[in-house]
Amino acid sequence: MQAKEWAGYEPEGCHPKELISRMTALSVSELIVTTIDSFHDEYICMALENGFDVITEKPMTIDEKKCKRILETQKKTGRKVRVTFNYRYAPVRSQVKELLMTGIIGDILSVDFHWMLNLSHGADYFRRWHRWKKNSGGLMVHKATHHFDLVNWWLNTVPERVFASGDRKFYRPETAGFYGLKNRSERCLDCPEKKKCNFYFDLNKTASLRELYLKNEKFDGYFRDRCVFSSDMDIEDCMNVIVDYKNGTKMSYSLNAFVSWEGYIISFNGTRGRLEHKCEESVYTSGDESVQGALRPEGTWIKIYPNWKPAYSVEIKKSEGGHGGGDPIMLSDIFEPEKQSEDKLKRAADHRSGAWSILTGIAANHSMKKHIPIKIEELVDNLELP
């Protein structure tokens, strides 16, 4: 529906088996992949093997087996794979990159990174297909790939070893009991507790939700409004990760999906001082026509703490649009390359950056399951640097 409004005509659909023939007939040069995460490798490899370049959303894929398949197919075909890490393009995050590149805090020895998903955006992952790792790889892959890529990019390095601990502590039946929701349904539409549940999700709230999901349930059987307190899911909502990087930097990272505000706090500790950056994002729910990841200026800042000198704030670059203003800049970079000059920040990401970002999360998944540190080379060896 939205594509029709934006493009001015009805988008053409086809069966997956007909995709390559239709692309060939239409003289298409690239395939844009935005399927459920677990299918990314199928379409990426299909396109590469048939001579097409690929633009894919994050995460590039969800496990090391699928990652290897993409890397091997890319190497064999020589075609291009671009991963759309829009967070790199947000002016404030580019500003952090620029500051670090100046050496303002010296060599970076450690990083503390804490990401919060609020009770709207965070809860939404537990309603949808993301709630099963077989579809999404869990939040360590689906969501944190953004965050791990930012650190790889900010520090110009890659991960070597990962140790993680995680659990589902909030989105479970016990929490429904805590809130007095004793007669809940497995979906919101017919739930007897809808009037007193703060997590009630109304599929009739907007035309886009109704048209895209509710009216299509009879065709695909997909329920967009599953109960966030169901026991029928296997992803975590509370995760802590320790990462050792190739350049010697250490990072402590956390992701919590049930916090009262949305955004992150990151601190870089260097030989000459400390850089702190906080970012608050607006409330967002997929499909409700709101802007995803728009910044709240009053809650976004950068501060420098030089060794033995007074701390000071850095004026933030203004931005508009989704993902901190990164979406419009990235879209221009992809679809209007003739307008771009050389990017000294190297924000465009290929299959190598896509692989390094997901492998931190994939290693974290293995570590949470086995309770041991995981080396990246044990998952995918001889991976090229970006």
Positions of PLM-derived features:
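Alpha/beta-hydrolase fold catalytic core
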Residues: 209-255
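N-terminal Rossmann-like dinucleotide-binding module
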Residues: 1-10, 21, 334
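Conserved acidic residues
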Residues: 12, 29, 160
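Short acidic-hydrophobic, aromatic-tinged amphipathic segments that line or gate anion-handling sites
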Residues: 12-18
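Beta-strand-loop-alpha-helix segment that lines the small-molecule cofactor/substrate pocket
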Residues: 25-30, 36-37, 41-88, 103
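Catalytic cores of eukaryotic secretory-pathway lumenal/extracellular enzymes that build
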Residues: 37, 41, 62, 66-71, ...
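C-terminal helical cap and adjacent loop that interface with cofactors, partners, or active-site loops
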Residues: 235-386
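Predominantly a Rossmann-like dinucleotide-binding segment in NAD(P)-dependent oxidoreductases
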Residues: 87-226, 334, 371
